[in-house]
């Protein structure tokens, strides 16, 4: 298992990035003929660096511009020591905070629901870890927002799609406020989805 750097010019693999691990641990669940693969990502942008995850490793690494790996997060307990595996994935990184989400390797095969997780944030200044729930304040009832969308680029923290029929219904029930209420007022059920972006603060590279 490794990360690959591929040339945009000709599609060649120019570099293989190996992350050491003691064995193979993966969130994929198998039960008889069933194979269930949850959605998860192993590469995340972080300013001028990249965060690389190997689900078999207890260490999450930074891949630096000079091509070297630097440890970023070391988890405890070790993934190999857990009876029920709980994986850790970064989601959004800022100057002060590292947002993450856990994923429990567990599925109820009567409902085919599972892979429950918890949202965590590490405060670099306070050296403290917290569990959190993020809400969209444009909903009166404060709809929960996930930071687990597909990684985009270093400037976009969240990219969430809101379906027009759901927004129209929420608007008619008086469940919206703020900018989202203004947008929903001009929608009908046949309108295109609304894309909500949350941008990270601007940053400058200092030499």
Task: Place the predicted regions along the sequence by residue.
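Blade-level signature of beta-propeller repeat domains, shared across WD40, Kelch, NHL, RCC1
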Residues: 153-207
């Amino acid at each position: 298992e490794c990360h690959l750097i591929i040339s945009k010019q000709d599609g060649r693999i120019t570099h293989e990035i190996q992350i050491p691990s003691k064995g193979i641990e993966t969130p994929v669940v198998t039960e008889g003929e069933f194979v269930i693969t949850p959605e998860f990502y192993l590469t995340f942008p972080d300013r001028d660096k990249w965060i690389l995850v190997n689900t078999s490793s207890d260490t999450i690494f930074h891949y630096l511009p000079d091509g070297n790996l630097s440890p970023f997060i070391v988890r405890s307990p070790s993934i190999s020591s857990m009876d029920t595996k709980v994986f850790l994935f970064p989601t959004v990184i800022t100057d002060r905070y590292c947002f993450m989400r856990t994923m429990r390797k567990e599925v109820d095969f009567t409902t085919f629901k599972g892979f429950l997780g918890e949202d965590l944030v590490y405060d670099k200044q306070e050296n403290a870890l917290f569990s959190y729930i993020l809400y969209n304040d444009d909903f009166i009832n404060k709809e929960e927002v996930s930071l687990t969308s597909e990684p985009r680029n270093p400037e976009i923290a969240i990219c969430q799609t809101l379906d027009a029929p759901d927004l129209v219904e929420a608007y008619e029930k008086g469940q919206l406020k703020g900018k989202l209420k203004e947008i929903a007022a001009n929608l009908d059920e046949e309108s295109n989805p609304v894309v909500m972006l949350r941008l990270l603060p601007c940053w400058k590279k200092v030499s």
